[in-house]
């Protein structure tokens, strides 16, 4: 079953949001109590990359660039992920040669190209397995609100355009827990998007004493894009961001098709997309994350004129990742010495 985030989450509070407020109060109370629990501790530095809201914010590319930076510092990072949509049970180490998105989830498969990834609903058990494999740094992909593993540092990612939506807690809005609870337990915020669009994010950070950092997504295409016209399709948290990124590198998006996040395309879906593109003489464009799900069903063989887009990040502070990792390790050492 695929569920897309409702549009009213990302607008000013509506009548529907008002009607759902009683349910939000109950959910928010439970979420706050859950975040107050004492999590299990592992003898490794732990950096959590999370977000305030349900839906895509850009966590996966952040974890990837942090993995790359950690390796340049001589570390062996391991990534803990729940593995949304996985079918494998227990703790599982992702193997890019043998696993596919259907079995382990699309995001873990992307992450496994850059670091060892353990998926499990039990994040502590996954971290233990990574430690057994020789990892000396844990990067936790999501899990900030669940408190299933002690974290030395929590970096929360915000999409500059969407921000916190209407500012309400689920189901009246996109917040995973009351904002004041999340702000009190996180360490810093990374706003992803154009700098001008990040301005409104300053408002809810001001006065917290927490730092705010900036980055923007830089698209990487599998083929030349400039001057080509596209039918772009995606089943990710925020497909509009992907469509806009094609225009940023001089591609022309003529038509778009959006699907729910983590959606597994069918033969009929791709047949329809190919027909639309052929009629209009367009190239097809999709994300690397979507492509892992297409490959999982071996549907990529018959697709012609398809360009796959990956992303990296450009940080306002060039040394952001290295400084962050050094802070995480320093906090871990302080925690260890205080025992």
Swiss-Prot record:
Top-level class of the enzyme under EC nomenclature: transferase
Pathway: Glycolipid biosynthesis; lipid IV(A) biosynthesis; lipid IV(A) from (3R)-3-hydroxytetradecanoyl-[acyl-carrier-protein] and UDP-N-acetyl-alpha-D-glucosamine: step 6/6
Protein origin, superkingdom: Bacteria
EC number: 2.7.1.130
Record-level GO BP terms: lipid A biosynthetic process; lipopolysaccharide core region biosynthetic process
Substrates-to-products reaction catalysed: a lipid A disaccharide + ATP = a lipid IVA + ADP + H(+)
GO MF, one example: tetraacyldisaccharide 4'-kinase activity
Record's keyword terms, sorted: ATP-binding, Kinase, Lipid A biosynthesis, Lipid biosynthesis, Lipid metabolism, Nucleotide-binding, Transferase
Signal peptide start and end residues: none
Pfam family, one: LpxK
Disulphide bridges: none
Gene Ontology cellular component list: plasma membrane
Record flagged with keyword Lipid biosynthesis: yes
Task of the protein: Transfers the gamma-phosphate of ATP to the 4'-position of a tetraacyldisaccharide 1-phosphate intermediate (termed DS-1-P) to form tetraacyldisaccharide 1,4'-bis-phosphate (lipid IVA).
UniProt family annotation: Belongs to the LpxK family.
Protein name: Tetraacyldisaccharide 4'-kinase
Organism: Bartonella bacilliformis (strain ATCC 35685 / KC583 / Herrer 020/F12,63)
Gene assigned in the entry: lpxK
């Amino acid at each position: 079953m695929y569920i897309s985030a409702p549009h009213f989450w990302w607008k000013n509070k509506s009548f529907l949001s008002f009607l759902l407020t009683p349910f939000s109060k109950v959910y928010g109370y439970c979420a706050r109590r859950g975040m107050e629990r004492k999590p299990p501790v592992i003898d490794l530095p732990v950096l959590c990359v999370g977000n305030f809201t349900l839906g895509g914010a850009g966590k996966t590319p952040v974890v990837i660039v942090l993995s790359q930076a950690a390796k340049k510092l001589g570390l062996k990072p391991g990534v803990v992920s729940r593995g949304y949509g996985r079918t494998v049970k227990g703790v599982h180490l992702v193997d890019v040669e043998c696993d596919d998105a259907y079995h382990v989830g699309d995001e873990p498969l992307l992450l496994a190209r850059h670091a060892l990834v353990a998926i499990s609903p039990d994040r502590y058990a996954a971290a233990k397995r990574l430690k057994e494999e020789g990892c000396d740094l844990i990067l936790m992909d999501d899990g900030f609100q669940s408190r299933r593993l002690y974290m030395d540092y929590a970096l929360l990612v915000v999409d500059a355009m969407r921000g916190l939506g209407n500012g309400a807690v689920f189901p009246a809005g996109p917040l995973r827990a009351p904002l004041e609870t999340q702000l009190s337990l996180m360490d810093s915020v990374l706003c992803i998007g154009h700098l001008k669009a990040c301005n409104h994010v300053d408002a809810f950070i001001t006065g917290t004493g927490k730092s705010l950092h900036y980055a923007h997504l830089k698209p990487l295409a599998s083929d030349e894009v400039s001057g080509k016209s596209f039918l772009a399709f995606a089943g990710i948290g925020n497909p509009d961001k992907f469509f806009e990124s094609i225009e940023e590198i001089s591609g022309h998006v003529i038509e778009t098709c959006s699907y729910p996040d983590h959606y597994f395309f069918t033969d009929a879906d791709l047949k329809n997309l190919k027909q639309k593109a052929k009629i209009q003489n367009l190239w097809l464009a999709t994300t690397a994350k979507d492509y892992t799900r297409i490959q999982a069903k071996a549907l990529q063989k018959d697709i012609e004129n398809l360009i796959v887009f990956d992303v990296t990040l450009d940080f306002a502070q060039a040394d952001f990742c290295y400084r962050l990792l050094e802070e995480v390790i320093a906090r871990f050492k302080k925690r260890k010495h205080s025992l």
